[in-house]
Amino acid sequence: MALTPMMVEYMKTKEEYNDCILFYRLGDFYEMFFDDALTVSRELELVLTGKNCGLEERAPMCGIPHHAAAAYIPRLVTKGYKVAICEQLEDPKQSKGIVKRGVVKVITPGTFIDSNSNLENDNTYLMVISEYEDKFGIAMSDISTGEFKTTSFNNIKMSLLDEISKVSPKEILVDININEELLTEINNVLPVLITKKDFNEFLVSKEELIEQFSDLEVSGLTIEREIPSKVLLKYINETQKMSLTNINLLEQYEIINYMTIDGNSRRNLELTESIREKTKKGSLLWVIDKSATSMGGRTLRKWIDEPLIVKDEIEKRLSGVEEVFNSIGFNEDLRSALKEIYDIERIVGKISNKNVNAKDLLSLKSSLDKLPCIKELLKNTSSELLKGYYENLDELIDVRDLLNDSIKEDPGLGLKEGNIIKDGYNNLVDELRESKLHGKEWIAALENREREFTGIKSLKVGYNKVFGYYIEISKSNYNSIPEGRYIRKQTLANAERFITEELKVMEDKILGSEEKLINLEYSIFVEIRDKIEEEISRLKKSARIISDLDGISTLALVALENDYIKPEINTDGLIKIIDGRHPVVEKVIGKGDFVSNNTALNQTDKELLLITGPNMAGKSTYMRQVALITLMAQMGSFVPATSANISICDKIFTRIGASDDLAGGKSTFMVEMWEVSNILKNATSNSLVLLDEVGRGTSTYDGLSIAWSVIEYITKNKDLRCKTLFATHYHELVKLEGILPGVKNYSVAVKKLKDSVVFLRKIVEGGADESYGIEVAKLAGLPENVINRAREILEDLEGKNTFDINKVSSCSMVSNNIKEIAVDSTKNSEDKVISNAQNIDVNETSCKDTTKEKILRVETQNAEYEEAIKSLKSEITKLQELNKKHNKKHKDVSNDNMQINFEVMEKENFIKELSEVDILGLNPMEAMNTLYRLVTDAKKLQ
């Protein structure tokens, strides 16, 4: 059996769009067949039926009314499906044979604009990622606003993932040959639809790129930016089936011109959505976005995502906010005008996409009506930013006048229903309307006349699209109908419908006028739309100014409402905040209940603030607060404090909270270590780093060792030494102040009562002496017997704990000194063994000395160590010889006054293990553990 002719045409179209759900227009319905029908039926919960397709079995089918498609398509697209719309391209009544059909648009997550969405303040980005030699190239576009940008950077995976996290595209295009490992990581960062294309073939020519933009813009592209731009434009043209005129500016940007914030940090700081609810509420954007327009809302989000790092640019924006902040009346008038402005960017996008309607153009006219008022308000401003807005704002008077003269104030819902064009704009429209009006009057007169003639008061003249005009008489009055007066047209259950020759003639006149009027109004509307389309560049420029102005106005309003202050900006590495507050927490609990805190960070004595204190005391909130205040200052916003002087940070990193990646096979601790590793590899001396409870995911001593080692790495690495907030529950680490450069102790103030503690939420100088873990557990409601038993166990453990950080620190310094001697005096592995062995010559007295005394002692003992190295070298050689001969000798090794006798040296593995230990390559805690194990093994040989 063969497929029916219609189904053959369907299969041809489906083969071309096999990665899409095909909406196939049949009459008044979009129909889906086979697998598409099964998918749509499942996802949209529609009834699944069947259709005879010429095969033995009926084809699975489901459908939706064409006028209801707008309600169903968004549900499919948000689930990650692509939808191809196949329309009838000719009138079925005039078609000979199979109706000609074709795909008129492909709707994908990256190209879909839902006018009914409540996310109008969000951008819908489509992104292309390409690799060329040692560079990543990115191009992105929001076709609804006409934005089209490109950038490139070194082939550093983290930079790519950070950019994806920042932009948050709805769809990503990659080359078919992309590295699968990279693809997996992209999916882990942002699980969106990824479309693969062959970038060698799927791209427009350079000439097409120039035609879309300009020769000047395209000639400035490097090859790594040109490739993704060509691919992106190709995909837009392929899905939209047309060239979009609102995409007329190709912007290049550099990622180094904005603060870098990786995906983890964006999530931890809750910049645009809360961690728990994944919604805007509870985020920084929720606090700041009081925008008057949708365009302003999108601008504020961009400013949060891309804080500035150039001092002049930050201060320019701050000065603009300050001027509006200082003039409350000005801002009230400005916001009153801004609230009357619709989303000009997206209306322009609809004009370009040929799907704008009359109400959209009325919204545009209403928006343009407010531009003269806004320009007048800006006339006397003094800041560089606002003066620039005044000088560059185009009032678009000609476009406004065109719309004012042509579009009716109450237009019809559909463009093919008429009632669009104003009276007086077109003479022919006026004449046809007059004819239509007279026709309707004639119909009303006919109805009255026939009622009087027949005496049937219920007689009426009606109309429908199938039968046209008719005279309807109920069956109860059937006997009153004059014989031969009417021609029967239709019989109903309770009535009869008739026509007359006179009515038929008038019907042709009326319907002819209506059809001509509808077609004429539509053609005039298209002319108006095309005239406005010619001014898209001007419209976009004014829309950009309005959106930026709304952003400035909103920042001023938020500052006024929340008692924010203008921060000072410096490049000296100093962050000084007086009475800083967390903008989101303060908004939730109320300003009066929030405890403010001071912060002082620099690149000398307060490089790393070591913050100790119990859980739930507010350490994490304080750390996030410092990061958010820094970010707000660099985006040009006032900040929640009484005073703030902020050093420009090139990057913000955070390691806060516990998480795991079970799907990726990573434990909580593994994820934590991966995040810390990423920070240590990518932070610079100008970065701000927040580390919370490093080492929490493993055993106490392992965690303590890692936390200590990370602090050492940050403070001792001359190429790093970044501003760091390091919160920990290892209160033993407070002794690092004075030992490591730049470490300063702070803690959360706690008021300890008889059986409980009160968290004062105040950050004070000095370290905490205990963790108050049991008190926190009690507050959480653990049973009393569990709490009491925990106290007993704690007392027992504390009695046995002999850990001394000063002792380990001394060992570390001696080890470092020996390492220097070893480098100078020995060049082979045997010398390295001797140098390692020397690490045991530390006595208990030296570990109790002050730091200065320890340093002096180390310096004076260098000569003794050199002699000891020679002596130990000789002894080790003897041991190796004795071992080969299986002779038993005696030798003593001293460690903290402990004597160990090696009487039996037959086991080669002990000597081998001792010779292979690289104790200088271990951190102090690892060195102690290794030494302890070797001593234990040695005892077994006695």
Curated annotation (Swiss-Prot):
- CC per GO annotation: cytosol
List the SMART domains: MUTSac, MUTSd
Alphabetized UniProt keyword annotations: ATP-binding, DNA damage, DNA repair, DNA-binding, Nucleotide-binding
**Does this UniProt record's set of keywords contain Cell membrane?**
no
| Matches recorded under CDD domains | ABC_MutS1
Instruction: Spell out the protein name for this chain.
Output: DNA mismatch repair protein MutS
- Residues given in the record as ATP binding sites: 613-620
Known PANTHER family for this protein? DNA MISMATCH REPAIR PROTEIN MSH1, MITOCHONDRIAL, DNA MISMATCH REPAIR PROTEIN MUTS FAMILY MEMBER
What does this protein's UniProt record list under function? This protein is involved in the repair of mismatches in DNA. It is possible that it carries out the mismatch recognition step. This protein has a weak ATPase activity.
* Alphabetized GO MF terms: ATP binding; ATP-dependent DNA damage sensor activity; damaged DNA binding; mismatched DNA binding
- Please indicate which superkingdom the organism of origin belongs to: Bacteria
- Per its UniProt record, what PROSITE patterns does this chain match? DNA_MISMATCH_REPAIR_2
Q: What organism is listed for this UniProt entry?
A: Clostridium botulinum (strain Eklund 17B / Type B)
UniProt gene name? mutS
GO biological process: one example: mismatch repair
Family annotation (SUPFAM superfamilies): DNA repair protein MutS, domain I, DNA repair protein MutS, domain II, DNA repair protein MutS, domain III, P-loop containing nucleoside triphosphate hydrolases
